[in-house]
């Protein structure tokens, strides 16, 4: 499979004002990373946006169970928005548990992208389904796209230094590459980020970039995807903008409040997701 980034030629592109996308999977599937990367790429493109990450309440919930599902929702728009959206227009479900946990929120006729390799009988039962939801009729109200993410990942990495179970750690890049194609997001920014993050592990960087491009190319080569979408740049006042989440906003508020009050800031916390960002922000002061 050609790993070069394809052009936008010969595609039917539909312009839409906004879209809400939710990525969902096991807490180890890298959905927060995928959502954050898509968000950052959209911000650099010029969209306005808002995000809503969601983490399992349980510590070390069993893999493949609803209790262990992690999700990341983002709304991008060509106008000023204030919320991460309500019902997602697109749901990426990495396993049956993610589908079970989030399907009811998906908008009617919404796009549903499934990691079909995860829909084994044991995983279907573990998620609480009595029958395979893909054949029971309960997905008939949606546009379903089944993607063999694990198979594609193994094929993409077969000539790399990554082996064994570590190979499937890159399957989230398949999802990110595909969504990047569907919404005409460039890959260059994510490639640069991957190279910087794994500059001491070039073999890992290479593997993730390969998977990213394979996911992107999958959208082109599979006939099921008839066209793509584009959300144009938002018309916002000129100035400098930055992406922050609630934790970083809270950190900045604590710093500003302490300085205005002339007090020394003290913060006590346990370093666990999703509160770790507060500690990471405050250690720099």
For the regions a protein language model found, what residue spans apply to each?
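Phosphate- and divalent-cation-binding pockets in alpha/beta enzyme and binding domains
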Residues: 101, 277-278
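Carboxylate/His-rich catalytic cores and anion/metal-binding grooves
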Residues: 209-210, 256-273, 279
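Conserved small/polar residues in nucleotide/adenosyl-binding loops
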Residues: 283-285
């Amino acid at each position: 499979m050609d790993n070069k980034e394809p052009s936008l030629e010969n595609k039917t592109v539909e312009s839409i004002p906004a879209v809400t996308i939710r990525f969902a999977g096991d807490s180890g599937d890298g959905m927060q990373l995928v959502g954050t990367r898509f968000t950052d790429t959209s911000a650099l493109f010029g969209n306005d946006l808002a995000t809503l990450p969601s983490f399992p309440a349980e510590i070390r919930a069993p893999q493949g169970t609803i209790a262990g599902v992690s999700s990341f929702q983002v709304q991008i728009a060509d106008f000023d928005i204030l919320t991460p959206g309500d019902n997602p227009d697109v749901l990426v479900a990495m396993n049956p548990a993610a589908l079970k946990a989030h399907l009811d929120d998906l908008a009617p006729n919404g796009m549903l992208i499934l990691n079909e390799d995860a829909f084994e009988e044991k995983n279907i039962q573990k998620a609480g389904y009595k029958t395979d939801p893909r054949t029971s009729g309960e997905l008939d109200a949606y546009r379903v796209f089944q993607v063999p993410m694990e198979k594609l990942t193994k094929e993409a990495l077969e000539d790399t230094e990554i082996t064994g179970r570590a190979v499937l750690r890159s399957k989230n890049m398949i999802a990110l590459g595909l969504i990047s194609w569907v919404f005409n997001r460039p890959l260059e920014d994510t490639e640069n980020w991957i190279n910087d993050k794994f500059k001491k592990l070039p073999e890992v960087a290479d593997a993730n970039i390969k998977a990213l491009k394979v996911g992107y190319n999958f959208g082109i080569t599979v006939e099921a995807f008839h066209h793509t979408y584009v959300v144009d740049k938002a018309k916002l006042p000129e100035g400098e903008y930055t992406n922050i989440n609630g934790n970083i906003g809270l950190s900045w508020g604590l710093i500003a409040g302490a300085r205005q009050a002339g007090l020394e800031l003290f913060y006590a916390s346990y370093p666990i997701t999703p509160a770790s960002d507060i500690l990471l922000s405050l250690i720099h002061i």
